[in-house]
Amino acid sequence: MAADVLGAPVDGAISIDDHRALLAITIGPQQADLSFEQRLAHEQGWELGFAKRAVQEYLRFAYLCVHAGPCTPSVEVDQVWHLHLTYSRDYWGPFTQRLGQDLHHGPTKGGESEDTRYEAQYASTLAAYARVFGRPPPADLWPPAKERFASFPHQRWVDLRKHTLTSRRTLALIGAGLFFGGLALGWSFGSF
């Protein structure tokens, strides 16, 4: 028997019972050797606890999509959504049935007007989150709109088997160390 559809917010806020039911939703088969949360943590390079929190935020986001108008996810929540879509039987079956409607994920059309629209929509999502759930979203999973969209054009998928990632700060420190180390060696051998 299918679970009941989650109710709409009452006086702008989700009911305690519906919030509990929302967070009780499980994704994927529970008897698998690798749970949804474990797969998410592995694929994203996250700690398992962070992945579990990201899934809870994704569930809240999905609820907002149904009850608070067009919403835009944080990068982390979007990664949960992408993985959930690969669990298609679960996604298009029990999950959307519980939400009470289908929830589609579409790409941007691109361009400056779309960037502006999605940034404003994301800010509205943060405001709706605070209103519906009675508290602001956690900043480590839902950064402010300006911060969330500042890094977006610079993000890339990277195959860590082929590439090593080093921060620019670390590279600058290594470069400075090599430069000053070279000066010290040159000075000690009388080259300067």
Give residue spans per PLM region.
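Acidic, Ser/Thr/Pro-rich intrinsically disordered cytosolic tails and loops
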Residues: A2-F192
